């Protein structure tokens, strides 16, 4: 009985490790090639550093595979962040589906994305165990330093009709010269937000190249 218990425990341990092991996506400096969900090639600027990959179960509901890339200054202060995430609800959560209400969309390389933007303090309202918590921890663990505030655009592509799988790309920039509160409603630079947002979207489209390796 003890032997059977040990074997079962070892099997469960191996199974858990297999679930958590990074997928076989290829990272070559500034390029990610995924062979499934979706089949895609994502190319970032050659100036980026690949921080690393984190595979984890998000809030007990989704399997997430997170890739982080940064552009930094000489003191390793993050100036730009490229956050690429492949996410799939767990089979044990069949009733869950992604819902995005953004009216804005962008098509890159044949992939249609929902588009959202925001500005925030880097350490503002980070939920323990969230994907944001994971990426900040990964970046800091490599000796990089996060800026006080960032301006960000999130691109989300839903892979399937059931809306259970997604490719998410977040592009963020150091908010130089402003505090996040300055650009929010009622802030002293609120009138500049739309212009800064438009410029951010242009740069995101220019800096992130996406190509389907088969029909998306």
Q: Whereabouts are the PLM-identified features?
A:
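N-terminal targeting sequences that direct proteins away from the cytosol to non-cytosolic compartments
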Residues: 2, 17-73, 177-216
């Amino acid at each position: 009985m003890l032997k059977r218990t040990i074997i079962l425990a070892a099997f469960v341990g191996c199974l858990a490790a297999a679930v958590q092991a990074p997928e076989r996506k290829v990272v070559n400096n500034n390029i990610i090639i995924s062979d499934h969900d979706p089949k895609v090639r994502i190319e970032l600027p050659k100036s980026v550093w690949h921080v690393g990959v984190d595979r984890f179960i998000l809030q007990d509901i989704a399997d997430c595979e997170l890739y982080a890339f940064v552009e930094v200054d000489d003191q390793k202060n993050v100036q730009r962040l490229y956050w690429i995430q492949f996410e799939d609800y767990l089979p044990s959560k069949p009733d869950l589906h992604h819902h995005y209400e953004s009216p804005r969309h962008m098509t890159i390389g044949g992939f249609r994305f929902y588009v959202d933007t925001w500005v925030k303090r880097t350490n503002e309202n980070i939920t323990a165990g969230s994907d944001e918590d994971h990426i900040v921890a990964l970046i800091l663990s490599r000796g990089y330093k996060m800026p006080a505030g960032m301006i960000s655009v999130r691109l989300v592509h839903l892979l399937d009709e059931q809306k259970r799988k997604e490719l998410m790309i977040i592009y963020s920039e150091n908010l130089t010269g402003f505090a996040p509160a300055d650009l929010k409603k009622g802030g002293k630079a609120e009138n500049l937000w739309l212009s800064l947002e438009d410029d951010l979207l242009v740069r995101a489209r220019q800096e992130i190249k996406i190509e389907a390796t088969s029909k998306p």
